[in-house]
């Protein structure tokens, strides 16, 4: 009786283990692209890297790409019928560069099912539609990405150089045109293409806690009087001596505008007057008029390279009720003493973030400004950028787009189609069905296939 139970229980356990085990896919499972391709001087067959090619083989592959492009051009014209298909390189092993789909245990290429190098059968019409749908979804995702990139306006966080210039303009009050000219390498860093905490830094002026911290900071420039401001409406940035040192002035305000006594503490360069309300009472009527608020912009000088020690000391404020005549040469002396308006604490945070490839959150900025000491306030740090090291140019290295008779720009090595959406941000799935591959094409003849192993 016990032995008979073994005959019934053991097969059930074996079937349960077989059903619960995940399918073992071949290395190139989910690959959509040419059967033979060269990427970064590496030979790929069915999406799997095989070996590095030597210089002679790379030269042969480059010649093949050139001849293939010439064959396409000649075959599209009506007056040329003598063009022949170029010879496929020998290292491709007889595979052409036509697009294929690698499934769980077979490969679909040219509307036929292959297991290894053996031709099994042609596809049915229904299976052809499934394979064509996989290719169309892949092409649709790429074309949709390119079309949206051309037509749509750039969102915040998608243009690194512009966003970094705006961040410097908000935090350090630096002209955006200067940062765009002297910091073009920032666009090569993926750090500033992110959204989130960087965008929160643009709204520092709206936070009450941050206003108090910035108000307590001693790195507030002394504003010169408005009376004798030189007029320089146009800034020629080509005449700047140092690429990291910018000196410029803005337009001269009108003489009728008088600076207000009370100023907002979070904006050290712009004085914004409150609306003035004048009430005139007559015998029968009362008239109320509201003046438009005015904004007075004062000149500033900026230095990103060094921060002189003299700028960290506070100068006594002049009485604003005095006329400019009672203060001769006050404008020139204060303008020459104020050279930088950059807080070293902010520079230090940005420098550390660039070195560690991290982002600055609002909490760390508040904590750094609240815990300032003598060492941090007297030792400034300049901005430091991590430049990506470009690879050495290789004349034999082909581009990422592999030429061929089919859509070879879909080729991405080591990127299976099932995990492409989550691992590669360049492509986006048009719908959830993109993850499903027609693996039943291989399972139809899997048991009866003599070449399956």
From Swiss-Prot:
Region annotation Disordered: where it falls in the sequence: 140-161, 311-332
Transmembrane segments: none
Gene3D superfamilies from the UniProt entry: Pepsin inhibitor-3
SUPFAM superfamilies, per database record: Pepsin inhibitor-3 (SSF55149)
Protein's UniProt name: Uncharacterized protein C30G12.1
Organism: Caenorhabditis elegans
Lineage, uppermost ranks: Eukaryota, Metazoa, Ecdysozoa, Nematoda, Chromadorea
